Curated annotation (Swiss-Prot):
Annotated compartments: Secreted; Cytoplasm; Nucleus
Region (Important for receptor binding): 57-68
Motif position, Nuclear localization signal: 108-129
Composition skew (Polar residues), residue ranges: 76-90
Assembly description: PTHrP interacts with PTH1R (via N-terminal extracellular domain).
Pfam family, one: Parathyroid
Region entry Disordered, spans: 74-177
Name of this protein: Parathyroid hormone-related protein
Main localization, broad class: secreted
Organism: Oryctolagus cuniculus (Rabbit)
Length: 177
């Protein structure tokens, strides 16, 4: 009976020690440990990507700075009034591996550093100034304004045209109402 009591106590102590959290961890420790490992792995992956991106940016910045200083050195050696050599041309320079297929042009005679152009905001097109019209439009307007004057029956005097304009015809009057 004593032997059986010892076995029961040992089983009870074993179960209690296994299920009681050690060092403040809960019962489901292995499951949380796996989740934490996955999130930690993803964090390290993202950190590695950001470090790689930072290295790439630093490399490109350093490369551009070398090109810029090379341009400054080349222009400082040349006198300010001299013309550039006739055989200098803009040649295509390849960066990166052959499978990228990206070509960047190098302007050898350029003195100013590169400045990004501001993006154009889409908007309405600007209209021309209202005071400036093309000659053809002016002629068309003149001929249109001359039609009612020449079409009126009369002696051609200015008084006749004024009487035509001041007294509306019955057909035109019916259209207005």
């Amino acid at each position: 009976m004593l032997r059986r009591l010892v076995q029961q106590w040992s089983v009870a102590v074993f179960l209690l020690s296994y299920s009681v959290p050690s060092c403040g961890r809960s019962v489901e420790g292995p499951g949380r440990r796996l989740k934490r490992a996955v999130s930690e792995h993803q964090l390290l992956h993202d950190k590695g990507k950001s470090i790689q991106d930072l290295r790439r940016r630093f490399f490109l910045h350093h490369l551009i700075a070398e090109i810029h200083t090379a341009e400054i050195r080349a222009t400082s050696e040349v006198s300010p009034n001299s013309k550039p050599a006739a055989n200098t041309k803009n040649h295509a320079v390849r960066f990166g591996s052959d499978d990228e297929g990206r070509y960047l042009t190098q302007e050898t005679n350029k003195v100013e550093p590169y400045k990004e152009q501001p993006l154009k905001t889409p908007g309405k097109k600007k209209k021309g100034k209202p005071g400036k019209r093309k000659e053809q439009e002016k002629k068309k307007r003149r001929t249109r304004s001359a039609w009612p004057l020449s079409a009126g029956a009369g002696s051609g005097l200015a008084g006749d045209h004024l009487s035509d304009i001041s007294e509306p015809e019955p057909e035109l009057d019916s259209r207005r109402h």
